[in-house]
Each structure stands twice: as C-alpha cells, then as structure tokens.
C-alpha cells in the first residue's frame, strides 16, 4: 500500500509511505531556498515531488490531506498548474472523543491533469500518528499517552495503543499560540498591529527569556487573569472554552488577556514578564498533566509519553515533563510541529486501515543535495574530514553540506554552519553571520558517549528537543555554546553513526580533545536550508563550504559593511 500524505497549509510538505516504510518527505521550504513555513499553493509540487522519486500520481494507492481550521470541514483554495482547485478536508480536531480516525472523503485532487480521490483526517490526528508511529513505544507494540499542544487548541491528552486512540481530555484552556502572542505584547517583538503572525517568534522567545528572571508577583498576575478569564465558570470563559474551532476568536481572547496583563505590569521589565509567563505555563502544564495521570494511572502504558504539536519544540517544557518522574520515557519526534504533518497524514491513513503501527523511518530523508557549478570568485578542491577538522580547529567556520536534509525544523548537522566552540567570540560571530539577535544560542553537536561528561543530564538527544546544563568544569572550554543561563540546546550523535558529521566530530576530538562543534542552520535569512553548495557560496557570509568531500573556498574576501552586520528585525 503506497500512501501520499500532503500538508497544504504552512510548513507545507509531501510524504510517501509504502507498506509501513517512509520513502521520502519533502518540506517545501527546503526546496530551492524556499521561504520558511512555505505552504503548498500549487498541486504541481506534489507531481514534482513524486517524479523526483520515480513515481507518478497513478502509482499512489491513497492520497491523504491533512485537516485544518473548521468545525466540521476545512476548505482549501489552490492551483493545479493554472487551474483553480477547491478541496474540502477534515477539521482541526476530531468531532468526538473516538473520532481521530474519522475521515472526510473527497474527489477532485487534480494532479497532472487527472483527478484523484483522497481522504482527509483531522489535523491533530497527524500529530498523534506521527509522534506515536515513530516512537519506541510503537516499535515495541506498547501503548502510550500522547500530548498534543498546537496553535489554536488547548493541550490535549490522548491514549494510543496499536488497536486505536481516544481523547482523554483537554488539560487546561490556554491555546498553544499564547506563548508567541506574549511576544507581540512584551519585549523585542512587540507589535501594536497584531493582525500578522510570525511563526518563528516562539523559538526566539525561548532564548530571550534567559535575559530575564522569574518574578512571582508577575506569575500571580497571570494566574489571577487565567482563573478569571479562561478557567472561570462565567459566560465569557465558557464561550472561550467552547469556541475552540474559531481560531480568530481564540486569539482575540488571548490578546485581551495580555492587554489586561500589560496594564498591571507596566513597572516590570519585559524580559522578566516573558520569563515569568513561560514558567506560569510550565507549572500549569506539569500540574494539570499530573492531575490527569492520577485519574488514569491504571492505564497500561500511562508512563510512556509522546509529545507533538508546535509546543513540542519548547525544550524547557519537554524537560520539565521528563523531570517530573511521572514517565519512564518521553518521546518527541524531530518534527513535532507541522513540518511532520505530511508524514502524520500518511500515518493516520495507515492507522485507519491497520491500527497504529510503527513506521520504518530515518530523520535524514529530506531533499538530497543538488549538483551545482562553482561560482565566480570561488574555487573547489578535494578535502578530507581530517583536513576539514584542522580548518575548524583554526577557528574558521565552515558550511557543512552532506547527504539528505534532515526532517523537521532543525539542521541536525547535514545543512549546518560548523565552528570550533572554544572562543567566546564565536557565538557573536555566528549570530552576526546569521543576522540574529545577540541573545540567540548556538547549538553544540556532540558525540553521544561523551555528552554526559560535559552536560547534565547529557542523555541522548539526537533531535535537539530537551534542555541540558553545561557542567561547570566545561563552561570555559566551550564558551560559544553555553547559553546565558548555562544551558545548552544539545544535539548528540552516535560515534557509530554513518553520517559524515560523526566522523568529523571524531577527527576534531582527536585534534583538540573536544568532542563537539558549534552548529547552526545553513540558510538565507528567513529561508529553508541551502539546496546546494553554489547557493551557500553565493550567500557569501562564510569563506569555506564543504560539500561531499570537496572544499569550496572564496578567493576574493570582501569585508562586511557595518550595515550588513546589523541584525535583521
């Protein structure tokens, strides 16, 4: 059975699964320097992705579209070539507690001039299915809980077992977008006009809050407003809780929440306000999930937790849940946000047919590197990994391009700017190169077996989804990757991994004794990863690009102007 999952809206992607094995997943932003979060606006993208992998639409047994906003159905308006197409889909959330696998069936998916039937499952179904089917619990045939906290929905807890899944309940009435919305009211991303939405704000705020401190008086303000505006037994609060299918109405309530907060917090620093709001939500999440577990502790698999939805990218909340001791294991896939929704749509269709089964998959299964010509003012020469390690040890950043792109929003080593972590100036230099704010962290990628020596807990974290503290005796040795609070957004990789980044780390370790490098994504500002070496060279902000055994080096070095070095807004 060959299933094609399609995510049409933001973080658009096309994925194909065959007999429980992931064949490929192409996120649109990772194609040709595409804009971040790019949607699928034209169905020709589906035809093109299939053709790249030797398939045409007739080779697909079932097409599945990820659901979106709507109480009973969602609506999509897009193109197929130059032909306008209107499609219907499933809603954002299931219509009843056991309705995760209820589909909306449609016809008229116009691909290459031919119409095809399709199914659509609720958006949350894709999150549940992608998280569980890629988890170690699915591989072992064990049930698990799955927490989905996304965009305009409250955090929802599901019970998933091979035979099916059901909603246990919503944990508390606070939509996932509340975290990013806070940034529109306080701090460097504050906007008087809040009609536009930047999907990148939440991740930036997670870094910015380290400039602040938790103030319990601020937490009390948020707690009080939450109890009266969201959780109270009043008509206004009940209407908010019941109107969950109306995204605009939910956001309006959240903006009103923060406007009321701002009136009470005029004397407080923005960084303290945001740090305190982060902790308010973290405590609420931990408290409410603990209360639910008290009522459902007898469920088999209740100590197994999967996390999905956009809030699954919050490494501090993930770590807080793991630290409660309520769970024996916590699994977060590398694509908890909507970058995993195409895979999730396909997994949802698998589950509807055969139950929730494990997916055979690899994180490095995005677009392959494209061939390209050496640009003017650049030269290319063979370069071994030991030679590359020596360049890095000389404190020279290098763009490292190898293999297929990773799935999800993290570069994970294959589309990365790498640098030695030993200089305190390197963090600022990399942030300047990327035109990022000074408070943004630079990630360490570390050999897995040595991570516990350097970080606490330092447990395996191949997808960069948990928080770690840098041990005191290492902070002066690797200052470029130590965040403001001493933490690190660690990525680990096994010494035995076939990925070339592992072999490079071993070479760097042999040269310096340090088993890690700085890593940050290699991309144009506001765009997906570089698709080829020439694109990285044309960007021109790093003098060396290593691509599959060849070192491309700039022959004419141009100094950046002061204007070029300004951080982008």
Curated annotation (Swiss-Prot):
Top-rank EC class of the record's enzyme: transferase
Signal peptide residues on this chain, from the entry's feature table: none
Keyword Transferase (UniProt): yes
One of the GO biological process terms: biosynthetic process
GO MF term list: transferase activity
Keyword Transmembrane: no
Entry EC number(s): 2.1.3.-
Keyword field: Nodulation, Transferase
Family: Belongs to the NodU/CmcH family.
NCBIfam families named in the record: nodul_NodU (NF041651)
Protein name: Nodulation protein U
Lineage: Bacteria, Pseudomonadati, Pseudomonadota, Alphaproteobacteria, Hyphomicrobiales
Name of the coding gene: nodU
């Amino acid at each position: 059975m060959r299933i094609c999952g399609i995510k049409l809206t933001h973080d658009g992607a096309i994925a194909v699964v065959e007999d429980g094995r992931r064949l490929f997943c192409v996120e649109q932003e990772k194609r040709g320097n595409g804009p971040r979060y790019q949607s699928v606006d034209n169905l020709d993208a589906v035809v093109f992705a299939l053709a790249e992998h030797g398939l045409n639409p007739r080779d697909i047994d079932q097409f599945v579209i990820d659901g979106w906003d709507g109480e009973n159905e969602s609506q999509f308006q897009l193109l197929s070539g130059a032909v306008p197409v209107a499609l219907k889909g499933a809603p954002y959330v299931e219509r009843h507690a056991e309705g995760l696998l209820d589909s909306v069936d449609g016809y008229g998916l116009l691909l290459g001039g031919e119409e095809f039937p399709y199914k659509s499952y609720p958006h949350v179904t894709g999150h549940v299915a992608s998280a569980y089917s890629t988890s170690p619990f699915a591989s072992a045939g064990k049930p698990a809980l799955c927490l989905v906290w996304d965009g305009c929905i409250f955090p929802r807890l599901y019970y998933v077992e091979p035979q099916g899944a059901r909603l246990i309940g919503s944990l508390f009435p606070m939509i996932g977008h509340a975290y990013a919305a806070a940034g529109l009211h306080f701090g460097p991303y504050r906007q008087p006009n809040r009609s536009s939405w930047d999907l990148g704000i939440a991740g930036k705020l997670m870094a910015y809050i380290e400039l602040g401190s938790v103030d319990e008086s601020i937490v009390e303000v948020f707690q009080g407003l939450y109890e009266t505006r969201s959780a109270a037994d009043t008509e206004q609060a009940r209407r908010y809780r019941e109107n969950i299918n109306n995204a605009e109405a939910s956001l309006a309530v959240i903006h009103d929440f923060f406007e009321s907060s701002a009136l009470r917090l005029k004397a407080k620093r923005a960084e303290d306000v945001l740090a305190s709001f982060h902790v308010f939500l973290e405590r609420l999440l931990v408290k409410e999930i603990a209360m639910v577990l008290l009522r459902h502790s007898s469920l088999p698999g209740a100590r197994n937790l999967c996390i999905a939805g956009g809030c699954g990218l919050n490494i501090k909340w993930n770590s807080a849940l793991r630290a409660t001791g309520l769970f024996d294991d916590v699994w977060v896939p590398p694509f908890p946000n909507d970058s995993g929704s195409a895979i999730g749509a396909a997994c949802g269709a698998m589950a509807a047919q055969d139950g929730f089964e494990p997916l055979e998959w690899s994180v490095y299964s995005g677009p392959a590197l494209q061939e390209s010509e050496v640009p003017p003012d650049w030269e290319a020469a063979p370069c071994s990994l030991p030679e590359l390690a020596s360049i890095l040890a000389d404190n020279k950043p290098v763009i490292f391009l190898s293999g297929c792109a990773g799935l999800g929003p993290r570069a994970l080593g294959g589309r990365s700017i790498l640098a030695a972590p030993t200089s305190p100036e390197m963090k600022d230099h990399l942030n300047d190169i990327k035109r990022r704010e000074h408070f943004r962290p630079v990630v360490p990628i570390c050999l897995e077996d040595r991570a516990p020596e350097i970080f606490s807990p330092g447990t395996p974290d191949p997808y960069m989804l948990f928080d770690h503290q840098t041990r005191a005796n290492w902070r002066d040795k690797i200052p470029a990757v130590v965040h403001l609070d001493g933490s690190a957004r660690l990525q680990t990789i096994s010494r035995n991994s076939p990925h070339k980044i592992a072999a490079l780390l071993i070479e760097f370790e042999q040269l310096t004794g340090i088993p890690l490098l700085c890593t940050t994504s290699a991309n144009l500002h506001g765009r997906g990863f570089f698709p080829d070496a020439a694109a990285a060279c044309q960007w021109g902000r790093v003098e060396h690009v290593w691509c599959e055994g060849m070192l491309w080096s700039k022959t004419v070095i141009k100094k950046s102007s002061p204007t070029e070095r300004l951080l982008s807004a």
